[in-house]
Amino acid sequence: MDLLERLGLGGRRVLILHHDDLGLTHAQNGAYQALGLPTGSVMVPGAWASGVKGEDLGVHLVLTSEWPAPRMRPLTEGESLRDEAGYFPEGLEALWRKARAEEVE
């Protein structure tokens, strides 16, 4: 039995709204709670990740910190995942140049 059948929606088209980037800011978390969306994904290195509560939350994989603020740091000691200031690299090109597979895993 697939998810839609378990929800009593078998054979129907449905729209599932998913709140992305939870944990990045307090405002993101507040919007998620206020809107009551059914699903979301948490950016665990985000400064507000511990404030996210929900039953159907996934993990948003974070390996870059592309915005000037807020910047995010790796939760591990992986040096190849850090820029000179200790944050994730700003973009994919910088990540690919430096990242070591064993630290990404």
Question: Where are the language model's segments positioned?
Answer:
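N-terminal pre-catalytic segment of deacetylase/amide-hydrolase enzymes
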Residues: 1-15
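Acidic (Asp/Glu)-rich catalytic clusters
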Residues: 7-8, 30-36, 49-58, 73-76, ...
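Structural preference for beta-strand elements that scaffold enzyme active sites
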Residues: 14-16, 37-41, 54-60
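Active-site mouth loops of central-metabolism enzymes
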Residues: 14-25, 93-104
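N-terminal start-of-domain structural block
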Residues: 17-42
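Acidic-and-aromatic substrate-binding clefts and catalytic sites of carbohydrate-active enzymes
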Residues: 22-26, 42-52, 64-68
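Histidine/acidic residue-rich metal-binding segments in metalloenzymes
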Residues: 53, 104-105
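Active-site gating loops and adjacent loop-to-helix segments of metal-dependent hydrolytic enzymes
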Residues: 68-100
